[in-house]
UniProtKB/Swiss-Prot annotation:
Protein name: Small ribosomal subunit protein uS3
Gene Ontology biological process terms from the UniProt entry: translation
Listed PANTHER family: 30S/40S RIBOSOMAL PROTEIN S3 (PTHR11760), SMALL RIBOSOMAL SUBUNIT PROTEIN US3C (PTHR11760:SF19)
Gene field: rpsC
SUPFAM superfamilies noted in UniProt: Prokaryotic type KH domain (KH-domain type II) (SSF54814), Ribosomal protein S3 C-terminal domain (SSF54821)
Naturally occurring in which organism (per UniProt): Acholeplasma laidlawii (strain PG-8A)
Length: 256
């Protein structure tokens, strides 16, 4: 049977970049990879309610000791920061104790969580754990993603759907999701929903557009704006022609 490869790994080095950015001697690479996994596991567990979508790790070797810079992308920055940044400061102190290095944690807000595959998959998983219909959860996620500017989305839920004795898979698709086009910016993520009748697997593919030569992946994931109207620009009435002043209507005048 033909299997589908991970779209994120397939495009790595072509239109996507690495989430861990550092160089080290060959003897130090295994320890640093293990340390990266420890940092990601800690952040995902402690900031799970904040909606973590991506974690980027950069390492710089300073004179005194190594410095680790972490970019944490979340959909709810208020929960990640806490009152007077108490949650963030506590996480930084814990990471410095675990790694024995200087840690800088930058929390970045995700403006459109409706079209981020990781957050969409987590949202569907939470709804399934709360006994929501798997069909309704997928359809609502598709509608929100398309409304936020995604050009295509595909979802798939597998397991004992509805408590059935035999496991099966059921998914929905809307728009275009070109998996074989390497310049296509396809965001992919998985999640698990732990229900009373077993674990359900969720897969989400979201297509943001093509990354043309000279562009980056950030050009296809700009914040969505309704129509062609720019921020701060006033909308022109339909009946008025460009370059003409809109006709004012007198409310006191009576028509024959």
């Amino acid at each position: 049977m033909g299997q589908k490869t991970n779209p994120n790994g397939l495009r790595l080095g072509i239109i996507r970049t690495w989430e861990s950015k550092w160089y080290a001697d060959q003897k130090d690479v295994p320890a640093l990879i293990k340390e990266d996994a420890l940092i990601r596991e800690f952040l995902n567990e402690n900031f799970s309610k904040a909606g973590v979508s991506q974690i980027e790790i950069e390492r710089v070797k300073a004179k005194s000791k190594e410095r680790v810079t972490i970019k944490l992308y979340v959909s709810k920055p208020g929960i990640a920061l806490g009152k007077e940044a108490s949650v963030k400061n506590k996480a930084v102190s814990t990471l410095e104790y675990l790694t024995k290095k200087e840690v800088i944690l930058n929390i970045i807000e995700v403006r459109r969580p409706e079209k981020v595959a990781v957050l969409v998959a987590q949202s569907i998983a939470e709804q399934l754990e709360n006994r929501a219909s798997f069909r309704r959860a997928q359809k609502m996620a598709i509608q929100r993603a398309l409304k936020s500017g995604a050009k295509g989305i595909r979802t798939l839920v597998s397991g004992r759907l509805g408590g059935a004795e035999m496991a099966r898979s059921e998914g929905y698709s809307e728009g275009r999701v070109p998996l074989h086009t390497l310049r296509a910016d396809v965001d992919y993520a998985t999640a698990e929903a732990k229900t009373t009748y077993g674990i359900l697997g969720i897969k989400v593919w979201i297509y943001h557009g093509e990354v043309l030569p000279g562009q980056s992946i950030l050009d296809t994931r700009k914040p969505f704006e309704a129509g062609n109207q720019k921020r701060g620009q006033k909308r022109r009435p339909r009946n008025d022609q460009p370059g003409q002043r809109p006709q004012q209507r007198n409310r006191n005048s009576k028509e024959d």
